[in-house]
Regions:
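Divalent metal-binding pocket/active-site signature
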Residues: 15, 100-104, 108, 113-196
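An N-terminally biased module of ancient metal coordination in phosphate/nucleic-acid-related enzymes
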Residues: 1-74, 156-158, 164, 171-183, ...
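Non-transmembrane, interaction-prone segments in cytosolic or luminal domains
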Residues: 115, 121, 127-138, 214, ...
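Mid-domain alpha/beta scaffold segments of enzyme catalytic cores
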Residues: 20, 31, 38-105, 109-126, ...
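Active-site gating loops and adjacent loop-to-helix segments of metal-dependent hydrolytic enzymes
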Residues: 67-94, 137-161, 253-269
């Protein structure tokens, strides 16, 4: 059973519609899929019905932007199979709104630097909240950047540039708890990306169910660490493509990383 449990659509910072993603998933034999949008569960019930049209079981999903309260290190928490999304959205909404305001400040920085850009220019690229990827896509398509992930993205929005400022994320343990209390399963996403394995004892205590094994950033080196952590803490191993469409420097197609069967089967129970 082929399952891709980490996908982003236009509902957050992916470039493709959910129907387009489901079409691509069906074409490569995906049978189970989860839309794991950043800090929103919007449209999760409609997506389940849409998936049936393509012979795909769509699991309720989310990716919560969190952090280690002690170190401040970023921690992403995936949630699957929740029965209600109210508490999850209540936790995530301030983060989503803060990200949008952060993006508006980034636009102001660009204006001061001489770029021709307004909020109205970028809004058509966003579903509800503006992400920095929407900003740089507009700059690319308006001829002000030679590629989406160019100078603005790397030198202005990152690396200590004038538009490099972040937002306050939720406590990672709180994210795990709210997913669990909503009837779902909480998973530590791509720990190799942030190298945040040290938070596992706290997350396990909060109810962590799984850890992401198959992911574009997880080469053999990181998979070894993940497998050991899964054994040490009694966690299921999950996986997915983390597809963002054109909003990835290296394109990750739907189905390019699959969830191990044991976790997928457990989530379907």
């Amino acid at each position: 059973m082929k399952a891709d449990l980490h996908i982003h659509s236009v509902f957050s910072d992916g470039s493709d519609s959910r129907e387009s993603i489901l079409q691509k998933a069906a074409a490569v034999g995906i049978k189970v899929l989860a839309f794991t949008e950043h800090d929103t569960t919007e449209g999760w019930q409609e997506s389940i019905a849409l998936g049936r049209r393509y012979g795909i079981t769509v699991l309720p999903g989310v990716e919560i932007s969190a952090c280690n309260a002690e170190t401040g290190k970023k921690v992403h928490i995936l949630g699957y199979g929740f029965k209600s999304a109210d508490a999850i959205n209540a936790l995530c909404r301030p983060v989503a709104e803060a990200r949008h305001e952060n993006s508006l400040q980034k636009i102001k920085v660009l204006q001061k630097l001489g770029y021709k850009i307004t909020e109205a220019d970028v809004l058509p690229y966003a579903h509800k909240y503006i992400f920095k990827k929407h900003i740089v896509r507009y700059l690319f398509e308006s001829g002000q950047e030679d590629k989406i992930f160019g100078h603005v993205y790397h030198k202005i929005f990152h690396g200590g540039g004038p538009g490099d400022f972040g937002i306050k994320y939720v406590n990672a343990a709180s994210a795990v708890k709210v997913i669990t209390e909503s009837g779902g399963k909480a998973v530590l996403a791509h720990p190799g990306q942030q190298n945040n394995f040290e938070i596992l004892p706290e997350l396990k205590k909060a109810g962590l169910w799984g850890i992401e094994l198959k992911h574009p950033v997880h080469n053999a080196y990181w998979q070894k660490f993940v497998l050991q952590a899964a054994a040490d803490y009694g966690l299921f191993c999950t996986g997915g493509s983390d597809c963002h469409g054109i909003y990835s420097e290296k394109y990750h197609a739907v189905g390019s990383n699959l969830c191990p069967a044991a976790a997928a089967e457990e989530l379907l129970k």
